Amino acid sequence: MDLFDFFRDWDLEQQCHYEQDRSALKKREWERRNQEVQQEEDLFSSGFDLFGEPYKTNKGDALANRVQNTLGNYDEMKDLLTNHSNQNHLVGIPKNSVPQNPNNKNEPSFFPEQKNRIIPPHQDNTHPSAPMPPPSVVILNSTLIHSNRKSKPEWSRDSHNPSTVLASQASGQPNKMQTLTQDQSQARLEDFFVYPAEQPQIGEVEESNPSAKEDSNPKSSGEDAFKEIFQSNSPEESEFAVQAPGSPLVASSLLAPSSGLSVQNFPPGLYCKTSMGQQKPTAYVRPMDGQDQAPDISPTLKPSIEFENSFGNLSFGTLLDGKPSAASSKTKLPKFTILQTSEVSLPSDPSCVEEILRESQHLTPGFTLQKWNDPTTRASTKMLEDDLKLSSDEDDLEPVKTLTTQCTATELYQAVEKAKPRNNPVNPPLATPQPPPAVQASGGSGSSSESESSSESDSDTESSTTDSESNEAPRVATPEPEPPSTNKWQLDKWLNKVTSQNKSFICGQNETPMETISLPPPIIQPMEVQMKVKTNASQVPAEPKERPLLSLIREKARPRPTQKIPETKALKHKLSTTSETVSQRTIGKKQPKKVEKNTSIDEFTWPKPNITSSTPKEKESVELHDPPRGRNKATAHKPAPRKEPRPNIPLAPEKKKYRGPGKIVPKSREFIETDSSTSDSNTDQEETLQIKVLPPCIISGGNTAKSKEICGASLTLSTLMNSSGSNNNLSISNEEPTFSPIPVMQTEMLSPLRDHENLKNLWVKIDLDLLSRVPGHNSLHAAPAKPDHKETATKPKRQTAVTAVEKPAPKGKRKHKPTEVAEKIPEKKQRLEEATTICLLPPCISPAPPHKPPNTRENNSSRRANRRKEEKLFPPPLSPLPEDPPRRRNVSGNNGPFGQDKNIAMTGQITSTKPKRNEGKFCATFKGISVNEGDTPKKASSATMTITNTAVATATVTATAIVTTTVTATATATATTTTTTTTISTITSTITTGLMDSSHLEMTSWAALPLLSSSSTNVRRPKLTFDDSVHNADYYMQEAKKLKHKADALFEKFGKAVNYADAALSFTECGNAMERDPLEAKSPYTMYSETVELLRYAMRLKNFASPLASDGDKKLAVLCYRCLSLLYLRMFKLKKDHAMKYSRSLMEYFKQNASKVAQIPSPWVGNGKNTPSPVSLNNVSPINAMGNCNNGPVTIPQRIHHMAASHVNITSNVLRGYEHWDMADKLTRENKEFFGDLDTLMGPLTQHSSMTNLVRYVRQGLCWLRIDAHLL
């Protein structure tokens, strides 16, 4: 106790010494603070919100809550810190507790030692006697902490005053407490002054020499105020003060303990208060952000940031400079955080700041200059390249002492100066507005730079700026964070993430300067930035699109080889790529490249999905599921090529130029991708070409962004331009395996260049040829088949839909084709190339009137064929129909021959577009189909061959092989048609069976389609062409949803019911696909069950049983009943095994209980009225008995009950199936002709028919119903 009192008194005396030395200055400072900060202090004491309104407005309360949770409630801290009595209590130096405090202080002192290296030696020697000096140390720490700093003078004095019981000092400190802001600035000075005084006290008792030695470095690092203190005080004292601000040594010494505690050499109470102070400083990080956002609202906080920069120096500055860097520094040394916070409070005493600034300038003029210049320089140096190079330097600098760091910082500063002239005009202005976001992103550095820029004009700001600069110099020397930054580190890390994300989204182009400013201390920041880059690399992906641009720009600006030059380059890049998000820069130069590559990969991948489907998610859309995947794979493989192409800087500029027109697009690109994959794919392909040829003008916004990403990410323009072949090869090789059958698909899925080329091919080869053929054969003689004409129009639409569905990318192509086709059809009518037609033939077979030969000879042959048809009921030739995936199932509404002509032309065109892909399928499908009747046992393939030879120009050759021979004038074709006419009905049914993939139903105009029934009556109805291609369940699900939504939008009940029935067919296909794929998550039974409900609902829309029901209603009811019957039967088959098991179990159970049941009156008969016999009660299993004995003598186990219920449900499906089938048979009798034709065309439907046959049969019937009801 005596020693403690002695030292405390001695500390007070030391305070008196320093006060005498500094009394005039302190008084001036206090007076100025009282005048300037009184209002701010009142606000603070009255509950001033640490998180300035602007900050909260921008970030919302969630961030404040999170900060409070992480760092503690500032309001609580504020009370403790701002309340003098609380401070005394926290300090725990009351006279009564003084003896205890020394002991407790030893522990806190360790933490302060961590913060302030000087303290540890002091504490080591004088922990018992150091209680007062530790408070002084605590004061420094608290001074470093804004709130701590405010209360710190009080604490120092309080710690001394309690020990010395000096009322004058105690009263003086409360006064200081009253002027918190003033006290803060003074407190800082006092911390420098009083603290040295206290330190000498501690130093005497404690070993201050080692700490003084350590402090010498921080002093040189630019803490002028401390330097003065050092000069006036023992080096030990000065060391303590300087190191607290953040000398590298102090940081290292504090590093280990800092994580443990923010405690500074405080008594136990003080220790707690220190922790609170740390929390408060942490909270100050946010006020700093608030200041940057609204300096007017929280001017004190803003200067405090400056002080933080000066005191917290490296740690706080780095944290502020870039929260990314803060994150890295945090990981490295969280200790500096508290120092930074404490510095925040001092900004309001300009004189102290100026003095410190002058001292710091003397100590480290280079750093001061750098810091002054840093606002702009930082903006320029913020470049990731600088950060990267600096990061390596900083890694060295962290362990290195201030001088070394200063040198490095000076060099960096010089580099920044070089780049600065360019960026300064742009970045500085941006820097000022940007600091708020910068503060968020980069913490104090942004605010410090901003304050520095503003501090020149404002004395308060100046002090803070000077401090920040001074701190900045040491900060550069020691990028390590303050030890108390453990909490703050979390906050900063979180803020960094938030700010980086916000910047990436909010600050497109402006963020670059902002980020530059926010990262103004790139010298120190590099390590932190690198750390943050690593941590934020995951965040960066959100901005991958822009990164490729950044990387390209950087490459372009990289002509300078030196790392310092990269800063200038970075500045240039920033200027040129202001649109790039801050996060891109934040990533850091090192990471950015990798990240950019990854990003480019991702971006490149995005364009693919977009091309593949309307939405990136849909890129695996039914038709192109495999192709998009292949393409994605290609993109995944492409990263390496991208890495290589990046070296091509000159090309990157070209990309940049191209991007320039589309820069706006990056944002819209996502929307564009989502909006339409077709447009994206087209644009991407076009973009590629445009990039090569017309990059600035043609590139579409969204597409441009994609192309940029594709080019930048996967390849630089040079690689795309120079190695476009290789790039195409890569994409082609990747895509070809997937799309090899269809170059068109490949082009769409492949890189833009390849896509563009494919587009050319599609336009020239496919469109022209197809158009010429289709009109030539189909359009001329559409008239012969009246119903056929109507259906012809409908058929092309469906076919187009089918093909489009299969090829999401062709959608865009289709968009272009329709107009071109209309224009080209007349032009190309007469051009018929047999080989081309054969190649172009799509899988879909659409019967076209055989009367449309473009040539006179063809016309004659068609006439002959027509005559023959009329005489022999020859079927019309089949022709490929246009692919329109969205409409593939909808029959075109054109009922007139003109519709047929157009449709035929369109069919030719569209077919040509998709033929490559479909050719193989079509041929295979057709070959797979065999004609079973009479002369038609020969397979479609053989017929196809014959027709191909005979019909030179018909695009329908392969599909029409059996039927279209009539079109050809050759006798062979005639013979073929003759043989096939007798079996037209069977052929058509077999063809549809083989070719129709119930998902693809397209109507073809059957000109004079003779459906040969047993009576050989002429049945002329359009027949849908079905594609045999297999799709996954998702594809059918999407189709079903489209139809269902279409039905939902209709008001006419019959049309609604028809569409619901059609949707039910798609759902049925989906269930069938689920059966094929055992990996499907959903049970096909469930799908069928839901389909049944939809059909039942559709049937309720129209009361077919009503006497007012029309034939159409009854026909629809028949089709629905057929579907229901087969669905029920199918559901039973799916559950048949379960039903068998249940049946066996139930039979066994009943056998076992037969005797018991005989003895007991049946509960069904007695209804539970009979009193159970004791025997029956005994027979009941107490465990299994689920029934109530009062209700009957027999109880059924729950297990048996469930089995019986399930068995009934399963077997009831069979009953329902037969019931509905019988109902359909009854209704069919009223429309024998309609269903006779349908059976003739599609083949009779039985209860054993497959789901595919059912779907095709019913869909064909629905098509006819639509035609009859004029719904097409």
UniProtKB/Swiss-Prot annotation:
Cited function: RNA-binding protein. Might be involved in alternative splicing regulation through an interaction with G-quartet RNA structure.
Gene that encodes it: AFF2
Gene3D superfamilies tied to this protein: 6.10.250.2670
Composition skew (Basic and acidic residues), residue ranges: 151-160, 212-223, 543-558, 616-629, 818-829
Region Disordered: start-end pairs: 93-183, 200-223, 418-491, 535-687, 779-829, 842-903
Record-linked Pfam families: AF-4 (PF05110), AF4_int (PF18875), AFF4_CHD (PF18876)
Keyword Zinc: no
GO biological process, one term: RNA splicing
Phosphoserine: residues bearing it: S391
Compositional bias per record (Pro residues), positions renumbered to this chain: 426-438, 844-853, 874-883
Stretches with biased composition (Low complexity): 439-452
Molecular function terms, GO-annotated: G-quadruplex RNA binding
Modified positions (Phosphothreonine) in chain numbering: T478
Listed GO CC annotations: nuclear speck
Basic residues composition bias: residue spans: 630-640
Comp. bias (Polar residues): 97-107, 161-183, 576-586
This protein's record includes keyword Ribonucleoprotein: no
Family membership noted in the UniProt record: Belongs to the AF4 family.
Xref: InterPro entries: AF4/FMR2, AF4/FMR2_CHD, AF4_int
Keywords assigned: mRNA processing, mRNA splicing, Nucleus, Phosphoprotein, RNA-binding
PANTHER family, per the entry: AF4/FMR2 FAMILY MEMBER (PTHR10528), AF4_FMR2 FAMILY MEMBER 2 (PTHR10528:SF18)
Highest rank taxon of the organism: Eukaryota
Record-given protein name: AF4/FMR2 family member 2
Organism for this UniProt entry: Pongo pygmaeus
Localisation per UniProt entry: Nucleus speckle
